Structure formats: C-alpha cells, structure tokens
Swiss-Prot record:
Gene3D superfamilies: 3.30.300.20. Keywords: Cytoplasm, Ribosome biogenesis. InterPro entries: KH_dom-like_a/b, RbfA, RbfA_dom_sf, Ribosome-bd_factorA_CS. NCBIfam families: rbfA (TIGR00082). One of its GO terms (cellular component) is cytosol. This is Ribosome-binding factor A. Residues 127-157 are annotated as: Disordered.
Length: 157
C-alpha cells in the first residue's frame, strides 16, 4: 500500500515537472522581453515532493562565464514574475518557487563533440597528406623496380 502511494506521488511530481518545463520554455521564449536573458533553453526541471520548490536547469549558448552569470542573475531576479506567468498557465494549488541553475552539460557536450570533430578532420587531413605522399613514393619505388625488371628481362633475350 505504501509503495503504491509513493509511486503515485513520484509520477505526479514527474508529470508536474514535465509540464512546468514546457510552460517555462514557452514563457521564456515568448513572454519574457528582458534583453539580458536572451536565448535560454530549459533542460530539465526537478520538483520537490511537496511541490514547494522547483530546480530549473537552464543553458545559455554562451562560452563567456561572466555573460552566463549575468544572464543567470537576470533569470533569478525575474523568477517571481516568471512564476506568476507560469502559474496562470498551470492549474495548481501550490506553484513551486523557481530556482534557476545553470546546466553546463549541454555546452560541454557540444564542446567535446567539436573537439572530436576537429581531431577527426585533422586525422583525415594527415592521412590524405601522408597517404598521397606515400603513394607517390611507392609509385617511384615500384616504377624504378619495374623499370629495373624490364631492363633485366631485355638483357636476357
């Protein structure tokens, strides 16, 4: 019996978190006019079991840590307003307090992917460069050997 209640609570908080993520993404994209925030992606939302708090994991496509911190501070200062906008869209008795947290995993993943792509491209360039040089060296060596073989066979006749 206790297990079923716990499972239902978890699924409800997860459903609320998913809906909150969707609503936050729409509000931040359409309704927020603050130029300090710019383009923001809501990666995940983690709602507490009592629905009093929600950790909102966001990403800005910026590499400069100072700019990221400014954007995060702008979101944090706008959190009560954002909460009000989202509360109007969701039918909850208690609207969780929003706590914005910068999530660098997406940016780090993109950075790692770019590094891997660069290494692959450099490796291909080296293979083409050395591969064509090796082929020309092989042609020269084989060409000389073939010519030597031809000379030897002509001399035997």
């Amino acid at each position: 019996m206790v297990r079923n209640i716990m499972a239902k609570e978890f699924s409800r908080t997860r459903r609320i978190a998913q809906q909150l993520q969707q609503e936050l993404a729409q509000v931040l994209q359409r309704d927020m006019k603050d130029p300090r925030i710019g383009f923001v992606t809501v990666n995940d939302v983690d709602v507490s079991r009592d629905l009093s708090y929600a950790k909102v994991f966001v990403t800005f496509f910026e590499e400069d840590k100072a700019v990221v911190q400014e954007k995060l501070n702008a979101l944090i200062s706008a959190a009560p307003y954002i909460r009000t906008l989202v509360a109007g869209r969701m039918k909850l008795r208690v609207m969780p307090e929003l706590r914005f947290i910068y999530d660098s995993s997406l940016v780090e993943g993109m950075r790692m992917s770019n590094l891997v792509s660069q290494v692959i491209n450099q490796d291909k360039a080296k293979q083409q460069q050395f591969g064509s040089e090796d082929a020309s060296v092989e042609d020269e060596v084989l060409g000389d050997d073939v010519a030597d073989d031809a000379d030897e066979t002509e001399g035997k006749d």
